């Protein structure tokens, strides 16, 4: 064994298996790229991203931890969102929530 080595089960690992997925169309209406990380409360993302924020409340991107999605100026794309789990209390970010979801 090598320090830090990970032994995973054989076969494909499915992230967030069984969680409901919400797909939203997101458009960057700004003049600069915007990048959103995997665990950012999507409803509180950059105000220049245009999408249904109410549908995104309590959700984050359905992408591997530590990764992000980048939106170039003028770009529009679909993104998969999944609900936060656990106590579902969101603090920080743009400070628009700060309460249980």
Swiss-Prot record:
CDD domains: Urease_beta
GO MF annotation terms: urease activity
One annotated GO biological process: urea catabolic process
Enzyme class: hydrolase
Keyword check for Ribonucleoprotein: no
UniProt entry keywords in alphabetical sequence: Cytoplasm, Hydrolase
Pathway(s): Nitrogen metabolism; urea degradation; CO(2) and NH(3) from urea (urease route): step 1/1
Subcellular location: Cytoplasm
Gene Ontology CC terms, in alphabetical order: urease complex
Pfam family, one: Urease_beta
Record EC number: 3.5.1.5
Catalytic activity: urea + 2 H2O + H(+) = hydrogencarbonate + 2 NH4(+)
Protein family: Belongs to the urease beta subunit family.
Subunit structure comment from the entry: Heterotrimer of UreA (gamma), UreB (beta) and UreC (alpha) subunits. Three heterotrimers associate to form the active enzyme.
Annotated protein name in UniProt: Urease subunit beta
Organism: Granulibacter bethesdensis (strain ATCC BAA-1260 / CGDNIH1)
């Amino acid at each position: 064994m090598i320090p830090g080595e990970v032994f995973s089960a054989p076969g494909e690992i499915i992230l967030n298996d069984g969680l409901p997925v919400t797909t939203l169309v997101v458009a960057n209406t700004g003049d600069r790229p915007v990048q959103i990380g995997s665990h950012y409360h999507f409803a509180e993302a950059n105000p220049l991203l245009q999408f249904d924020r109410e549908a995104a409340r309590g959700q984050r991107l359905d992408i591997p931890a530590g990764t992000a999605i980048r939106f170039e100026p003028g770009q529009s794309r679909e993104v998969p969102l999944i609900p936060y789990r656990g106590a579902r209390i969101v603090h920080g970010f743009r400070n628009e929530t700060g309460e249980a979801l």
